[in-house]
Structures are given as C-alpha cells and as structure tokens.
C-alpha cells in the first residue's frame, strides 16, 4: 500500500472521529439543555411557590396592620366621644349655673330697682325739706342764699389764709432746721474722715554742729565765709552761745532750706571757703528744685488729681515752703482738697472738681512778691494761663470773696478753707487769738451787772450767760443780750457770728412734811 492510501485512510478516520465527536458533543449539549430546562422549571416553580408564600404573608401582615389601625381609630373615636360627652356635661352644668346666676341677677336687679325708687322718693322728700329749710333760713336771717354763700366763703378764706401762714412758717422753720442739721452733719463727717497732719512752721531753723570749733570755720577769716553764705542765700546766720548749733533766720522758707542744705553739706565736707560755699549753694538750689517738683507730684497723688500742667505741679511744690500764720500752705491745700471732696460726696456732687479746686485754691501764694494783687486773683489768673476750666478759675478767685462764685464747688471750697484755717491749733496766731477771744468774751459778759456765771462755748461761737433771777427780770435779760452784742461787735474781731445766750432761771423749792 502506498502512502496516498494511508493518507486517505487517516483522513477518513479523522472525519469519522470528528463526526463521532460532534455527535457526542451534540448529545451532551442536548442532555445539558434538558437538565437546564428541568432546573429552570424547578427554579420557576420554587420562585412561584416563594412568591405565593410571600404574597400570602404580606396579605396577612396587611390585614394585621389594618386591624391594628382600625382598633387605634376605634379607640381614638371612643376617647373623642368620651371627651365630647364630658364637655357636653360641663356645658350643661355651666348653662345651669348661668341660668341660676341670671335668675339671681334678675332678683337683685328687681331689688335694686325697688331701692332706687325708694332713694328717689327720699331725695324728692329731702329736696322739698331743703327748700322749706332754705326759705325759712332766709326769712329768719334776712340773707339771701348768695349772700350767705359769700359770707361763708369769706370766713373759710380767712381761716385758710391763717392756717396756710402757720403751715408755711412751720415748713420754713423745719426746712431751716433740717438744712442746718444736714450742713452740720456734712461738715462733721468731712472733718472726721479727713485726718491731715500739720506742723507749725517757724521763721528759723537750727543746724546742729559736730563741735563748737566749727563755728569759727563757718565765720571764716574776717567773717568772709558767713558773709558769702548770707549773701548767696539771703538768710541770716545767727551764731551765739548756743552750744553746737547755728540758727538760720529768714522769712523765705525756700532760701532758708537752701541755706540749711548747703551748710550741712559744708559741715560734712569740712572744706569751708567762698568758692566751696558757692558750689554747695548751687547744689542745694538744684536739690530744692527737685524736691519742689517731687512735693507737687506727691500732693497730686495724695488727692488723686490728674492732668495738671507741669508748671502748676511745680507751683504746688513751692507751697511746701510757704506758710500762712504758721500753717504750711501745701498741707493746708491738701486738707482743703480732701474736705471739699468729702463734702461734695455727701451732697451728691462730683467730688473730682471740688478736690481739684481745693488743691489749687492757694496756688497764688506760690509766686514771688514781684507779682502784686490778692493771692486768690493771682491764682485764678495762673489757672487760666495753664488752661484750667472756667469753673476752676472762678472757684479759685472766689474762695476769699474777690469774685462771685458761679458753682457749688466754689462755695464748698470756701467752707473747706474756713474749716481748715479756723480749726484751733492749725495756725499759731489763730490759736492765740482764739484763746484771747474766749477770755475777752467771758470778760465782757462778767462785767455786766447781775451776771452769775458765763461760759464761752462752741469754739468761741457762743457765749452762754447765767444771770441772777432776783437782780434781772426777763426784760432786763433781753436788754443785757443786746448790750453785750453791741460791745462784742465794737471790741472783738471774729469770724462768722457769735451767739449771745442769756439764761434766767427761777426755782421754787418747798418740802412736804
């Protein structure tokens, strides 16, 4: 057999194999298709069964939900019916109550109508009686109704005028008493709250020396050292027998302070000659200037005043070295500031302005003697120059009456200034005058005939005189009081006014046995 035959046989075998393979594949495919169809039918049947079951379940759930909703609706309907029935019962009860009230009101209205009718009948009867009485009164009195009214009105008018005058007098008296009481309370409260320290200033200062040999060195050869120091400072040096002490005498406290500082530095340094004296005096002047500024700033700090011009602060510091009747002017100004502020607070006024004016009120005393005029006017011009407000300027100028006060603060500062200055002991000369005034008051009273005892009280503002009742009668007491007032006015100098109180007392004593 040749190769071609083998090839043909192989091809035939391959074709047969392919046909057999296709047959087998087709058969398997048909079997799978049949199985798939069966599976599909099975799945469909299961799905239909599941759907039917779910449908039945959903229907059951829907029926249950519907049943629940129906039950809820029925419950709500029952509750609403019950509420409606309850409201109906309440309405019926209210209607019954209203019917009862309406019936009661009708009964009351009927009773009121009857009473009204009775009242009208009584009024008619009263009018008839009144007319009869009026006619009878006119006949008896001989006056018409209008004349009687005019007479009564005139009598009432007179009584009202008298009562009004009495009432006005009582109100005025009470108002004055209340005002005096309130003023005393305000001033007393301010004085009690203000505790300022005062040191009576003098015109001399004592410098202690380590030994008496230092006196000769201070005097110097032919007195040139002491002359140089006196010339540069304007202060007199008194060197006497007082052991280990030199007295500086001068009316200008600033110069006296410069001399004190310079002399103490010279004593410590030990080199005392004209050139060294000049150097120390210059240093002392610079120290005093620094001290002046610090004192001014301290004063503003103590009083709580801010916004002052630097020159005003410097002038305030200079007040430390100014005295008025022995009273330090800076301490006095601080005290016036506190007093004015406290009184302003008690009266319901802003204390800031009052304290500012109180601190600056004596600023005119800080300038040198080259500036002429009252210190109040000078102070107001200085305040105006350094742009203080118009109220501050006016209050400074008015605190001694040189200008008309235009604010309550100005009046308060006047009062505070008088309180600070007039306090016994605040000023040396005032203390002496105070004691002399008390003695003179009692002397004037005791000179009068019939005086038993006399007492000067209220810091010399009142003299209380006890007289002998057998010597003077009431008229004589009045005459004595007038005479004493005239004598006081002619012989004494005093601030404000003095009350003369003459007391005559008669006692009758018997004993029952």
Curated annotation (Swiss-Prot):
Enzyme class, first EC level, given as a word: hydrolase
EC number: 3.1.-.-
Boundaries of every HD domain copy: 329-422
A single GO BP: mRNA catabolic process
UniProt xrefs under PROSITE patterns: HD, KH_TYPE_1
Chain's role: Endoribonuclease that initiates mRNA decay.
UniProt-recorded name of the protein: Ribonuclease Y
Species name: Clostridium botulinum (strain Loch Maree / Type A3)
């Amino acid at each position: 057999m040749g190769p071609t035959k083998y090839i043909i046989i192989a091809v035939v075998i391959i074709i047969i194999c392919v046909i057999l393979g296709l047959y087998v594949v087709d058969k398997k495919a048909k079997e799978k298709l049949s199985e798939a169809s069966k599976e599909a039918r099975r799945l469909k049947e299961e799905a239909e069964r599941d759907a039917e079951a779910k449908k039945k379940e959903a229907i059951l759930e829907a029926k249950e939900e519907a049943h629940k909703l129906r039950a809820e609706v029925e419950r709500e309907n029952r509750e609403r019916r019950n509420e409606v029935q309850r409201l109906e019962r309440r309405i019926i009860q209210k209607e019954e109550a209203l019917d009862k009230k309406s019936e009661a009101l009708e009964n009351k209205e009927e009773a009121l109508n009857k009473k009204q009718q009775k009242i009208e009948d009584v009024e008619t009867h009263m009018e008839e009686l009144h007319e009869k009485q009026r006619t009878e009164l006119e006949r008896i009195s001989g006056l018409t109704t209008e004349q009687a009214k005019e007479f009564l009105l005139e009598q009432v008018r007179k009584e009202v005028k008298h009562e009004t005058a009495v009432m006005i007098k009582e109100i005025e008296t009470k108002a004055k008493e209340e005002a005096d009481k309130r003023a005393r309370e305000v001033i007393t409260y301010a004085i009690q709250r203000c505790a300022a320290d005062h040191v009576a200033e003098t015109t001399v200062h004592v410098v202690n020396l380590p030994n008496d040999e230092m006196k000769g060195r201070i005097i110097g050869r032919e007195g040139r050292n002491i002359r140089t120091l006196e010339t540069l400072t304007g202060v007199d040096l008194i060197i006497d027998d007082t052991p280990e002490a030199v007295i500086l005498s001068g009316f200008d406290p600033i110069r006296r302070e410069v001399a004190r500082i310079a002399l103490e530095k010279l004593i410590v340094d030990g080199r005392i000659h004209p050139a060294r004296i000049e150097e120390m005096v210059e240093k002392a002047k610079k120290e005093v200037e620094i001290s002046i500024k610090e004192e001014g700033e301290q004063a503003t700090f103590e009083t709580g005043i801010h916004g002052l011009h630097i020159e005003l602060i410097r002038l305030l510091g200079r007040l430390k070295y100014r005295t008025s009747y022995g009273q330090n002017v800076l301490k006095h100004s601080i005290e016036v500031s506190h007093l004015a502020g406290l009184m302003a607070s008690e009266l319901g006024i802003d204390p800031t302005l009052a304290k500012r004016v109180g601190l600056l009120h004596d600023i005119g005393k800080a300038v040198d003697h080259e500036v002429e005029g009252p210190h109040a006017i000078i102070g107001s011009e200085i305040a105006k120059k350094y742009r203080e407000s118009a109220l501050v300027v006016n209050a400074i100028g008015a605190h001694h009456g040189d200008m008309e006060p235009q604010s309550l603060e100005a009046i308060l500062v006047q009062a505070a200034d008088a309180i600070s200055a007039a306090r016994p002991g605040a000023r040396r000369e005032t203390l002496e005058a105070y004691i002399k005034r008390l003695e003179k008051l009692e002397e004037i009273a005791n000179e009068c005939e019939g005086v038993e005892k006399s007492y000067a009280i209220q810091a010399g503002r009142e003299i209380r005189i006890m007289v002998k009742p057998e010597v003077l009668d009431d008229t004589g007491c009045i005459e004595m009081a007038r005479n004493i007032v005239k004598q006081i006015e002619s012989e004494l100098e005093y601030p404000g006014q003095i009350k003369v109180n003459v007391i005559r007392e008669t006692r009758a004593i018997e004993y029952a046995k």
